[in-house]
Every structure is written in structure tokens, then in C-alpha cells.
Amino acid sequence: MILPNIETFIGCESSFEEASIVLYGAPFDSTTSFRPGARFGPAAMRHESFGLETYSPYQDRDLMDISVFDSGDLELCFGSSEMALSDIQKRAEEILKSDKFPLLLGGEHLVTLAAVRAVAEKYPDLHIIHFDAHADLRDDYLGARLSHACVLRRCHDLLGDGRIHQFCIRSGEREEFRFAAQHTDFHPLSFNGLEEAVRELKEKNVPIYFTIDLDCLDPAVFPGTGTPEAGGVTFLELLEAIRTVAQANVVGADVNELAPMLDASGVSTATACKVLRELLLAIAK
């Protein structure tokens, strides 16, 4: 049973039964390699969302016109990545069994692996569209294979070649970029190639998991993240890319890597809230 959440993201007050989309938070950042704090992202987004309008002038849609249930944050073991991932996967499976769309709030990017495991069980031909500043394709980070620096490599272990589509990547080891060139559909530095990739996936009607690491945004727009990288995209570029991806058969998604305390101005949290609002409205049918 999924209990109601006390503090919800604005406009996400539907009951579980009537909702088509279910938010669930994974406040986990135990493998953070630079600046910690992403565990506080989901709660900050909910709290600060009430400074946001439910209406989007970009899409002429309103959160009050769609059905979203916010199930709150999971209680996760910070001392064990394996236990945390297991708990996240169980929640995602519960949502999927009810034929609802699971939308995960991180947390660091490792949490995506748990969601992908759950979604891939239901959709064995799953593809991933990945927006990020970092390739996240290391085989291990300081000996750990379960790390936010390795999450897409672990997803590749699960899905295989040609089923991960990466955009905006502008940081990583040389070996990661070489691995991507051989094993993923790799589009570094920008969203160039996104429309073509989405068109091909849409024609095949394959299921897509959509993961957004908010550090794909330029740190001038979004400094409140664990590993900021100069040279990112603007908010409007990200919004247009989200709307492009939403045209395809998206069956699960996440937004991750807001570390709110790293931006005392609150701008990063406000930006993350707006990204989530636009994502919800784009994927709602």
C-alpha cells in the first residue's frame, strides 16, 4: 500500500487510484564523488514548488488538469547502495503493477539504475534517453561498481548495445567516450541528433525510460548540483528537448542531482521545480 504524502509537489494531490502518474522520491547520495547534498533534492522541490504556478505558458497546460499522485520519499539506507536500490526498485515495481507511470525524484543519479531494472522487467525491449553533463559510463569508481559515475554502464550491462541514447555529455574519462562511441547512441555537447533519434524510436514504438540529470544545464542556470560542468544547455533548450522526447513512448522517467544547499539563492531549486512541472505536463496523456 502506498500512503498519501504529507507535503506534495504543487498540483500533485490526486489519489493513488485516480492518478496516471506517480511521483516517488529517492533521497540518496551516498556515492557522491564531489559535493554531497542531492539527498535533500526531493524534499526541497516539494517545498519550493509552491512558489510555482501550476499553469505552464510554454505548453498551455495546467497540473490541475492532469492526475498525479505524490507518494513521498522512500526511507533508504545510506550505508548500503544495494539495499537502497532494492527499495527503490520495489516501489517502482509497485507503481508499474498498478499500470501507472513511475516518475522518480533523486537523489544522485545512481537511483536511476533501480528504476530501470523495474521498468525493464515490464518492458524487455526498453531504451533509455539520457540527458547529462557526464557520461556515467565508468566500469567502476574507486573500485565501486555501484556509483553515480557508473550508472549508465550498469544500465548498459542490463540492456546491451544501441539502446542507450546520450545527449549533452561534456565530461568523462577518455575511456568512457570511447566506450560510448562503440556501444551507445552518443551525442556529446548538445541536443543535436535528438529529433532524429526520437523519430526513429517513435516509428519503432519502443518503450523509453527518460532520465534527466539536471547538471545537463549550464551552471549559470543551475549551480546547485554535486558536479557542475561549464558549457551546458539553457532552460529553454532543455524544455524543448523534453517536449521532443515526450512525443515518443515514454514509460518511466526521473529527474535527479539537485543539491539545494549548494545554491543559497534558491535559483537551482526553482529551476528544478519548473523542469519537473514541464516534464509532468509533457508526458501526461
Predicted regions, residues:
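Conserved alpha-helical scaffold segments that buttress catalytic/binding sites
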Residues: 2-285
